[in-house]
Swiss-Prot record:
GO MF term set: neutral L-amino acid:sodium symporter activity
Family: Belongs to the dicarboxylate/amino acid:cation symporter (DAACS) (TC 2.A.23) family.
One Pfam family recorded for the sequence: SDF
Protein name: Serine/threonine transporter SstT
Topology with respect to the bilayer: Multi-pass membrane protein
Subcellular localization(s) per the UniProt record: Cell inner membrane
Reaction it catalyzes: L-serine(in) + Na(+)(in) = L-serine(out) + Na(+)(out); L-threonine(in) + Na(+)(in) = L-threonine(out) + Na(+)(out)
Sorted UniProt keywords: Amino-acid transport, Cell inner membrane, Cell membrane, Membrane, Symport, Transmembrane, Transmembrane helix, Transport
Amino acid sequence: MATQRASGLLQRLAQGSLVKQILVGLVLGILLAWISKPAAEAVGLLGTLFVGALKAVAPVLVLMLVMASIANHQHGQKTNIRPILFLYLLGTFSAALAAVVFSFAFPSTLHLSSSAQDIVPPSGIVEVLRGLLMSMVSNPIDALLNANYIGILVWAVGLGFALRHGNETTKNLVNDMSNAVTFMVKLVIRFAPVGIFGLVSSTLATTGFSTLWGYAHLLVVLIGCMLLVALVVNPLLVFWKIRRNPYPLVFACLRESGVYAFFTRSSAANIPVNMALCEKLNLDRDTYSVSIPLGATINMAGAAITITVLTLAAVHTLGVPVDLPTALLLSVVASLCACGASGVAGGSLLLIPLACNMFGIPNDIAMQVVAVGFIIGVLQDSCETALNSSTDVLFTAAACQAEDERLANNALRS
């Protein structure tokens, strides 16, 4: 009897709402950090294991899914990568533009006294682009080991096209391997409530939020701008694409992708979550198996906001005059930098000196701005990743649904 009850409880847990279970894990994590700091730090291992498992499975998932998708692609079957890529770039530029408007409407100032040492930012936008190109010709084993998604995509696409000329049994084997990896991903995702419990507990216990109060205004501007993009700008772009109420799709992506990304703080770790959501939304597998890992690499609206807001905060602090053309140029530079953020160790923060260079701000001061970014990183990085990752699914879904509707309308006319 006891065994039956235990198995029944496990079955209910396995089949229950994952979002509700995550909320329970979140509340329990906050309570544990409040009750016992040492215990909260100890259970941080659960969060580390969860994020590690996601990061471990994500590169293999991308390689197998893209390879299987291209190898089994039927001649004449259309994918929607081009419109999704356009949405990615337009969304990133719109986010940078919104950040410029926000920064001028609510100017922030910084206390530039600390220094960031042992950090070497890229010397220019050319170096960022060069880094991306070098990532494309990486050794496949090295790309898998270091989670270099540009390199993984290049090898997966190349092998996929090569396997189109292979035997059907070979294609079936690749497809079966892809399904096996997908099963492993679903298994890892079921442990999300436990992982988030550990992440929340350890974060609150080790960092707390007392150090953030000194940068409250800057955080309000940053997070407010990200909310504006998530709840106004992105829905407008989606409405332009699907011509109906975008908010059910927007909230679904924020709830089922953004929540995970907020706590894992890793676009790469969130790739399996986004893949699972795309499958749940019944999107075209040939499309999302390419667009999701591509989005994790170049769709960086949150990074564009971070670069723009922190750069203009430094500009306002130093009293550097900024005219409209320069502000627009900053939006373009921030967008280009953001698209290369995944190829730079330290991400968006280490690309701030590039943007600061536009205004003649010395590198030592720019690195102090980077140091401020690391201080507020607990919230800034979480919100940035949540926006970046949820937007990957949102734009993929919008493009796929728009294409499905177009095909349905054409069928009705004929």
